[in-house]
Swiss-Prot record:
The record marks 33-34 as: Reactive bond. PANTHER family: COLOSTRUM TRYPSIN INHIBITOR, KUNITZ-TYPE PROTEASE INHIBITOR-RELATED. It comes from Notamacropus eugenii. The lineage of its organism: Eukaryota, Metazoa, Chordata, Craniata, Vertebrata. It is found in: Secreted. Found in the whey fraction of milk. GO terms for biological process: lactation. SMART domains: KU. The gene is ELP. InterPro entries: Kunitz_BPTI, Kunitz_BPTI_sf, Prtase_inh_Kunz-CS, TFPI/VKTCI-like. Residues 23-73 form the BPTI/Kunitz inhibitor domain. Its main location: secreted. This is Early lactation protein. The keyword Endoplasmic reticulum does not apply. Keywords: Disulfide bond, Glycoprotein, Lactation, Milk protein, Protease inhibitor, Secreted, Serine protease inhibitor.
Amino acid sequence: EKCLDQIQVNSLENLSLLVPSLCLLPPVRGNCSSQILHYFYNTTSRTCETFIYSGCNGNRNNFNSEEYCLKTCRRNKNRNNNN
């Protein structure tokens, strides 16, 4: 059990080296009344997924398009594969 905890911690630490810190944030809907389909980077699935954004507040893991989300949060993927 201790080994599993250590693996999870090491995995998160390594992920933070590969992914910009804003992409590690959980999706936050915000507290306004709009319902806008936005994207956030999911560190578990390592892809961008949709969520409903209220139009205000929230955090920086919030993108208008899947393309921009992937471009921002997976930008180091090819660079790391070449090393």
